[in-house]
Amino acid sequence: MAGSLSEIKAKIISTEKTSKITSAMRMVSSAKLVKSEQAARDFQIYASKIRQITTDLLKSELTIGSDNPMLVSRPVKKTGYIVITSDKGLVGGYNSKILKSVMDMITEYHADGDYEIISIGSVGSDFFKARGMNVAFELRGLADQPSFEQVRQIISQSVDMFVNEIFDELYVCYNHHVNSLTSQVRVQQMLPISDLVADEAAEEGVTGFELEPNRQDILDQLLPQFTESLIYGAIIDAKTAEHAAGMTAMQTATDNAKNVINDLTIQYNRARQAAITQEITEIVAGANALE
């Protein structure tokens, strides 16, 4: 019985230590979430402005006849997917949701292997490589609040692959942050731009522009910036969802640990009571034997 009591007590102590660790990790994820949400709000100011300018430009007559490849829709022979996952685990179903969605799309639409994956996050990279899938580029070790400089190269590589007709459409696949408890899988088209904002442009009237130095130079500078802002915004959004998922997962782990501690404490008290009862019974039996 003494052995049983000591084993239960050891489990209680071990679970309490685990609970303290998961509680601390929840607090860290919570702090990261607050920073990411603020970063997303700050970036949205820039993103909305550049989107408005691009949409106004596309609904004007100034883009008619432009040969900028980012505006050109062409027959789709191959599709590019930027897939954003985390670099670590302990984020609940964050990674499994997006990976399942990507696998479903590839199974349904790309049985012939007519796709390229640009992977952001170690979990996704390892997942795709283990299955022998087409990973063109990858980025590991993304910061908790990634700067544009950190992701500039892989974004530029993705855009260049479209411009050079390695693939004919570009999508970004990620978890969109809704709130601290909820995220939604998003598969959002990035290129060609003409498809992306055509509906928005059609809803409003024509805007007049006078551009300096000339139309083509403006388009050549604006369109890459616009696309890069969309992809970077998706990365910030995905990171925010990741921190929220980590916070929720650690809160769940902490709650589960507390439930285990309560159950073990009840077991310990019952075992201790049984041990005391047995000792009393043995003492009484011994006293009766002496009479």
Curated annotation (Swiss-Prot):
One of its GO terms (molecular function) is proton-transporting ATP synthase activity, rotational mechanism. InterPro entries: ATP_synth_F1_ATPase_gsu, ATP_synth_F1_gsu, ATP_synth_F1_gsu_CS. Keywords: ATP synthesis, Cell membrane, CF(1), Hydrogen ion transport, Ion transport, Membrane, Transport. GO terms for cellular component: plasma membrane; proton-transporting ATP synthase complex. It is a peripheral membrane protein. SUPFAM superfamilies: ATP synthase (F1-ATPase), gamma subunit. It is found in: Cell membrane. Its main location: membrane. PROSITE patterns: ATPASE_GAMMA. It holds the Pfam family ATP-synt. Belongs to the ATPase gamma chain family. NCBIfam families: ATPsyn_F1gamma (TIGR01146), PRK05621.2-1 (NF004147). Produces ATP from ADP in the presence of a proton gradient across the membrane. The gamma chain is believed to be important in regulating ATPase activity and the flow of protons through the CF(0) complex. This is ATP synthase gamma chain. It comes from Streptococcus pyogenes serotype M49 (strain NZ131).
